[in-house]
Design a protein with these regions (language model features):
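Short glycine/proline- and aromatic-enriched beta-strand/turn motifs that initiate or cap beta-hairpins
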Residues: 24-76, 80-85, 196-211, 215
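Gram-negative (and chloroplast) outer-membrane scaffold detector with strong preference
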Residues: 68-149, 157-163, 202-205
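Bacterial Sec-dependent N-terminal signal peptides
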Residues: 1-30
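Outer-membrane beta-barrel translocator domains and adjoining extracellular loop/strand segments
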Residues: 56-64, 93-100, 132-142, 177-185, ...
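Generic short beta-strand segments
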Residues: 50-54, 86-90, 127-128, 170-173
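Predominantly the C-terminal beta-signal and adjacent terminal strand-loop region
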Residues: 34, 151-215
Length: 215
């Protein structure tokens, strides 16, 4: 448990440091919207995406992991969101499903505008996970549960009308799970480019009351 706590703490610090809401406005010539600028503060955002990663071993065993996250968030200011999300994923090895997973939890996402139509986004997820995996001792599926910590960058393209396309091109995550038969196991993902890729779409929803001056 001592080593588990150290790992969780280290990954959390790394993720928050990398994706902190205090991202410098000078980075890549980007800027964060000021509090008095017209922005999405107080709006809600809903999103859906499809994530994909592939690993081929020297024995030509192909492992494909796909997931479909869905989430809703709230703009606490013009640049940062907090929210909840859910994702289902499965792992296929040589066309056989060996792993099914559900995960749900909270997320935090800071952003920096890169001009008028592009956004650099970071996201940190903290999730409870549960599902089934193929047992190493017997050819049967067994239940598991645990948690996942994840940090990743995205590039967003503003489409107008509150819509945006988002592309995930890297990921750093830790998954810790346990079963009755095997106890705790730990796995990591640290990929970039085609090894871990995702594409999604989001929509901002504005329920704020508009003053007469806004009309």
């Amino acid at each position: 448990m001592k080593y588990l706590n150290k790992t969780v703490f280290s990954l959390a610090i790394a993720g928050v440091s990398m994706l902190s809401g205090n991202l410098n406005a000078q980075f890549l010539g980007g800027h964060r919207l000021k509090s008095d600028e017209d922005g999405p503060k107080g709006q809600f955002m809903v999103y859906g995406s499809l994530d994909y990663s592939k690993l081929t071993t020297p024995s030509s065993s192909s492992s494909t992991v796909s997931s479909a996250p869905l989430g809703v968030g709230y703009f606490i200011n013009n640049n940062d969101l907090v929210g909840v999300n859910y994702a289902y994923s499965q792992n296929t090895v040589d066309h056989n499903v060996v792993y099914k997973q559900n995960e749900a939890g909270i997320w935090y996402s800071p952003s920096v505008m890169l001009g008028k139509y592009f956004v650099l986004i970071g996201q940190v997820d903290a999730h409870y996970v549960w599902g089934q995996q193929l047992s190493t001792a017997a050819d049967v599926m067994q239940n598991f549960n645990g948690f996942r910590l994840r940090a990743y960058p995205l590039i967003g393209i503003v489409l107008g009308g509150g819509w945006a396309l988002k592309f995930k091109f890297a990921e750093l995550s830790m998954l810790q799970t346990k079963t009755k038969e095997e106890g705790w196991t730990k796995s990591y993902v640290a990929g970039i480019s085609g090894s871990t890729f995702g594409v999604g779409i989001s929509k901002n929803l504005d329920f704020r009351k508009k003053s007469k001056n806004d009309n």
